[in-house]
A protein has these predicted regions:
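Enriched for short, Lys/Arg-rich terminal
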Residues: 12, 25, 61-66, 70-93
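Arg/Lys-rich, positively charged N-terminal/basic patches that mediate binding to nucleic acids
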Residues: 1-31
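A generic structural signal for beta-strand entry/edge sites
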Residues: 1, 56, 75-77
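A short, surface-exposed loop/turn module that caps and links secondary-structure elements
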Residues: 34-59
């Protein structure tokens, strides 16, 4: 099982995100629980990012919302970095 860590930035973004989208809180909790068991399940649409987000990965919360993260395989740790719409997370504002 993977351990889970968050950044301060993620906590601020998540607080704002769930204030706007309280209906997605359960989906996020389910996603996190599934990630902890196996972060490479196909339904996450797990993918590596490029450009200024090189070295970061992303998974889908819903069709419209993404969670960016880093997975440290040697330590079995997942670090949550950001949550939001595709454009918010990938910096296209």
């Amino acid at each position: 099982m993977y351990s889970l860590t968050t950044t301060r930035y993620f906590l601020r973004r998540a607080k704002k995100f769930f204030k706007k989208h309280p209906d997605l809180k359960q989906a996020f909790e389910d996603l996190v629980e599934d990630l902890r068991h196996d972060p490479f399940q196909p339904h996450f649409e797990y993918h590596h990012l490029g450009g200024k987000l090189e070295g970061v990965q992303a998974v889908s919360l819903t069709r419209s919302y993404r969670v960016t993260l880093t997975i440290v395989l040697t330590e079995k740790e997942i670090i949550l970095l950001d949550i939001g719409t595709h454009d918010e997370v990938y910096g296209k504002r």
